[in-house]
Amino acid sequence: MELKSFQIEASEQIAERYESYMNDPLYIRKNEIVPFYQNLSAITGAGKTLVLADAIEQIRAMTTTQPVVLWLSKGKVVVGQTFENLSNGKYADNIPSYAIKPLLD
């Protein structure tokens, strides 16, 4: 699915924040970094799922390891829709070769 210009700008900003953070991360211990955290809020229908899917692809291109993404939402309906859209729905092509799993798996 194609992103709109404001969505591209948002996904690039998230990926750039990740890259910047990984260049100078916070540490829990000497060899244990605090994971990168990004919160995204926007009105319903703004394309948050698409923005984050695109950001994940950009982040994957920056790393030598497969990123692990914990995707949280307050609403059960939103969680179900997001799971479907990312695993085999309209956004699945935006994050190819990812294993999409519910948290309990």
What label would you give each PLM region?
Residues 1-105:
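RecA-like P-loop NTPase motor core of helicase/translocase proteins
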